[in-house]
Curated annotation (Swiss-Prot):
Function of the protein: Binds to DNA and alters its conformation. May be involved in regulation of gene expression, nucleoid organization and DNA protection.
Keyword flag Glycoprotein: no
Residues that span the membrane, as ranges: none
Pfam families, sorted: YbaB_DNA_bd
Keyword Oxidoreductase: no
Cellular compartments per GO CC: bacterial nucleoid; cytosol
Subunit (UniProt): Homodimer.
Places the protein is found: Cytoplasm, Nucleoid
Keywords of this entry: Cytoplasm, DNA-binding
GO MF annotation list: DNA binding
Name the record gives this protein: Nucleoid-associated protein A1C_06705
Amino acid sequence: MVNFNQFLKQAQSMQKKMQEAQEQMANARYTGKAGGGLVEIIITGKGEVAKISIDESLLKSEEKEMLEDLIKVAFNDAKQKCDEDSQNSLSGALNGMSLPPGFKMPF
């Protein structure tokens, strides 16, 4: 059986690692590109759009629909990178944490 004091120390360590991972994620930036770089979106680790860059060649009215699609693709690309990094950071924070039998984390 796991010593309760040892478990509490592990939980405190995990909490600290989780806070560090969350701070790291909040400061991270992820770039999504579409159309070979014609559209570029940078998002924060919180999934908020920080910047959008659009090549001038796409600013013609006949390119409107394509531009809308490229913005969507670029955002989804950046969001996927953010989600993957977030998952990896949180997994790393939990690494080495041994939980007592039957104890489940809420995520």
